[in-house]
Amino acid sequence: MKLTEKNITLFALTCFVIISTTWLFLNPIQPKEKHIAEIKEGDYVVIKGYIQEMYVKRDKYRHVINISRIVINDGTGNLDVVAFGKTREELLTYILSYNPMIKEGDYIEVKGRVTLYKGKYEIILNNIKDFKLLKKNNFERDIYLSPTPTGIYASKYGKKYHTSKNCPYGKRLKEENIIYFYSEDDAKALGYEKCKWCEEHGG
């Protein structure tokens, strides 16, 4: 092949692309650990902080079946963490793999590119390896509802629970609106108070 200025230029560009690609493969860009107050859009960072809030979807028995957003705080500010598709499914599996599940107060690490969405900074997880529990702080037990009738029940629209099948107030509840608890402690932990009639009549 005759060496011309054009051929030499193309050859040089090809070599540059190959060398650059190889270098990036062998030396991937490393994220920089920062405080939330220091980040800006486009930064590739590692953030460590406490879970402040989790936006989850639960089924009728209170099992978590989806996670839409996690808000973390490191003492300098808040950051939203989101995931989509397969990564969201893997995030849910990871969170539920702990007993009790990962929840508010737990100390975590996230890694990713900072984006801006509706005026808020967020990191979109591209890989479940970019989300890690560093320390479990919240050991409050996970509370679920019973799928079968128990002696402890309430309306899903109220805040009083009943323990007697003869309770005149409990009898007014429509079957489709009744939820059942495994224990009175579960009912109280979810913010329910015992019905006065059941309390007075030993139910």
UniProtKB/Swiss-Prot annotation:
Q: What is the protein name for this chain?
A: Uncharacterized protein MJ0818
Q: Name one GO molecular function term.
A: nucleic acid binding
* Source species: Methanocaldococcus jannaschii (strain ATCC 43067 / DSM 2661 / JAL-1 / JCM 10045 / NBRC 100440)
Record InterPro entries:
Ada-like_dom_sf, NA-bd_OB-fold, NA-bd_OB_tRNA, UCP021980_OB-fold
> Membrane-spanning regions, if any?
none
A Pfam cross-reference name? tRNA_anti-codon
